[in-house]
Amino acid sequence: MSVYSSILSHHRQSFPLLAILIDPDKEEAYLPLLPQLHQVDLVFVGGSTGNSIEPCITKLRAHTNAPLVIFPGNIAQFSPMADALLFLTLLNARTADMLIEPHVHMAMPILNSGIEAIPMGYILIDGERKSSVEI
């Protein structure tokens, strides 16, 4: 069953899922959590920097059978080692390149990798700190 189908199935049955977001750049924060990952239903992996996420995915794989889903902060955060990728569209982006450019650039690598792409739109609300999506 695909990751998305599993999420929908749980939703239809009113079963909650527990998902956590791991920032690969904050190894000191996520390493202590590894022994508890068996309690998690989904693990999102991603952050705001362009560092490789593959070392983090390798460590997570050794501690959980939960699907690993990339929550990309940018186009550098892609790995066919994950189970799925959130194909994100920032709906309140201020520049056109945030709306379409990453999608065009990554469409073929995602398709060729065979990784499950889960379409998702999101809106940033009142971010007090500057992030990778702001100028």
Q: At which residue positions do the language-model features occur?
A:
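Conserved N-terminal beta1-alpha1 strand-loop-helix module at the mouth
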Residues: 1-59
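Active-site mouth loops of central-metabolism enzymes
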Residues: 15-30, 74, 122-135
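Hydrophobic faces of well-ordered beta-strands that scaffold small-molecule active sites
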Residues: 16-22, 41-45, 68-70, 85-87, ...
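Generic secondary-structure signature for well-ordered alpha-helical cores
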Residues: 27, 65, 87-90
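Short, structured coil segments at secondary-structure junctions
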Residues: 39, 64, 80-81
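Short, ordered loop/turn segments at secondary-structure junctions
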Residues: 47-50, 73-75, 90-91
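Alpha-helix-loop-beta-strand connector modules within alpha/beta enzyme cores
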Residues: 54-75, 105-118
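Conserved anion-binding
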Residues: 77-135
